[in-house]
Amino acid sequence: IASRMSFSSLKRKQPKTFTVRIVTMDAEMEFNCEMKWKGKDLFDLVCRTLGLRETWFFGLQYTIKDTVAWLKMDKKVLDHDVSKEEPVTFHFLAKFYPENAEEELVQEITQHLFFLQVKKQILDEKVYCPPEASVLLASYAVQAKYGDYDPSVHKRGFLAQEELLPKRVINLYQMTPEMWEERITAWYAEHRGRARDEAEMEYLKIAQDLEMYGVNYFTIRNKKGTELLLGVDALGLHIYDPENRLTPKISFPWNEIRNISYSDKEFTIKPLDKKIDVFKFNSSKLRVNKLILQLCIGNHDLFMRRRKADSLEVQQMKAQAREEKARKQMERQRLAREKQMREEAERSRDEPERRVLHMKEEATMANEALMRSEETADLLAEKAQITEEEAKLLAQKAAEAEQEMQRIKATAIRTEEEKRLMEQKVLEAEVLALKMAEESERRAKEADQLKQDLQEAREAERRAKQKLLEIATKPTYPPMNPIPAPLPPDIPSFDIIGDSLSFDFKDTDMKRLSMEIEKEKVEYMEKSKHLQEQLNELKTEIEALKLKERETALDILHSEHSDSGTSSKHNTIKKPQAQGRRPICI
């Protein structure tokens, strides 16, 4: 009995739960999990907490002896080879990548998680990104974080603490942080009006065209023992030279692969075309082969699903996303309208004050003009009085000269000399009298003119006083009749099930599927032409500052691909050619 009681008490003390820490790209969460929980139970809990419905892209990642592994959905969490120390840590990350982010990523939370993960891969240089594309991507990252550019807020140096460019790009050019900020800000200013989700989607649309985007690389060896790289992505399997991760030596698109399998460390790829030999290679660990097969199965399933009609769940999500987008657009319009009305109200509130200030300025100017008019009138009156007195004095002198002349004429001069002298004096007196008369006449005219000027000055003074009186009696607050702004037209509601583009075909119809893929590539290249022109323009701007001696092998390879026109992800895929039953040489 005692032994049974001891066993029962020990059984009761065993923990029923354990703690798990989930690390996302921008947060950490902790959960208490039951001991019996499987991977799917924990994964579903995390997705519900995040509000994530596009679960097929994601997984819970952990590390085993420097090897990446993913939590299996049908296996108990604690049965995995994970640390038993609590909390058990998993990273919630994107396991599979979309071919076209804009069409496939529906929810805003999905787009945001992909944006954060891809941005980190580019900054950590796990995905090669050319310098001109790095600057453009940085400008969209700034738009997503800070919103619209405002020179009064986003002043010089506001990006000093931000990590926006790969260190490789910064070291490659003889440019200061201020010069990089200037170029990023120039692009950033052009993104005005884009919301956070729109800026993040533009980031992903550019990033998805990078050669290393979404590719998982594994070190392998072929039958000859040559070391190669295997790349697994949304489009298929690719074989690379270890020194060149940008351009595959050969590719196997998912629609051209018949079977994938592994036995111990040997991995086998069987092409659909039986004329092409089976490709076999060896990996370093059995665990790596399991991971490769997981990624192959998941990517192949998504590849085939994209080329079929959307499921009802996806259609509903897309309809809800459209409704949410329309709601946010309407909300942005409402906020913009409220901002405009607020600015107009502030202007209306300040208008009376501005009017009063303007009227004060007008009154001051009118008063100064009046004072100047009064001073001018006083001066003119004084001058007119002086001129009039001078004219009277000259007239008096002229009369005296005339009297003197008459007196001299009347005086009898006896001697001839006196007579001659007298005649000369008479002549001089006549000339002087004539000059006096002319000067008197001129002064009289000048006095008349001054009187006229005085009269005009008085009239100007009267008008200035009248204007000052009008300003003083003018109403300060004119009546205003605000006209309410019209409301925007109603945005149409959306049905739960919206229209969707259908690619319905049988899985066995591989020829038709291949034609569809080629058509998608052509359409994609047309869409990316404008973006490439923008990137070429920026590349030309900064090319002169490049330090050639600091170029990495990937920089040189990318430049060669750009010169040959094969820098696009779609252009680098090389398919195996069927030429009899010859083996594939890599």
From Swiss-Prot:
Phosphoserine sites (modified residues): 9, 514
GO CC, any one term: cell body
FERM domain residues: 18-307
Topology in membrane: Peripheral membrane protein
GO BP: any one term: negative regulation of cell population proliferation
Subcellular location: Cell membrane; Cell projection; Cytoplasm, Cytoskeleton; Nucleus
Main location: membrane
Any one Gene Ontology molecular-function term assigned to this protein's record: protein domain specific binding
PTM entry text: Ubiquitinated by the CUL4A-RBX1-DDB1-DCAF1/VprBP E3 ubiquitin-protein ligase complex for ubiquitination and subsequent proteasome-dependent degradation.
The entry's keywords: Cell membrane, Cell projection, Cytoplasm, Cytoskeleton, Membrane, Nucleus, Phosphoprotein, Tumor suppressor, Ubl conjugation
SUPFAM superfamilies: Moesin tail domain, PH domain-like, Second domain of FERM, Ubiquitin-like
PROSITE patterns, per the entry: FERM_1, FERM_2, FERM_3
Region (Disordered): 325-354, 557-586
Disulfide bonds: none
Role according to the record: Probable regulator of the Hippo/SWH (Sav/Wts/Hpo) signaling pathway, a signaling pathway that plays a pivotal role in tumor suppression by restricting proliferation and promoting apoptosis. Along with WWC1 can synergistically induce the phosphorylation of LATS1 and LATS2 and can probably function in the regulation of the Hippo/SWH (Sav/Wts/Hpo) signaling pathway. May act as a membrane stabilizing protein. May inhibit PI3 kinase by binding to AGAP2 and impairing its stimulating activity.
Subunit and interaction comment: Interacts with NHERF1, HGS and AGAP2. Interacts with SGSM3. Interacts (via FERM domain) with MPP1. Interacts with LAYN and WWC1. Interacts with the CUL4A-RBX1-DDB1-VprBP/DCAF1 E3 ubiquitin-protein ligase complex. The unphosphorylated form interacts (via FERM domain) with VPRBP/DCAF1. Interacts (via FERM domain) with NOP53; the interaction is direct. Interacts with SCHIP1; the interaction is direct.
This protein's name: Merlin
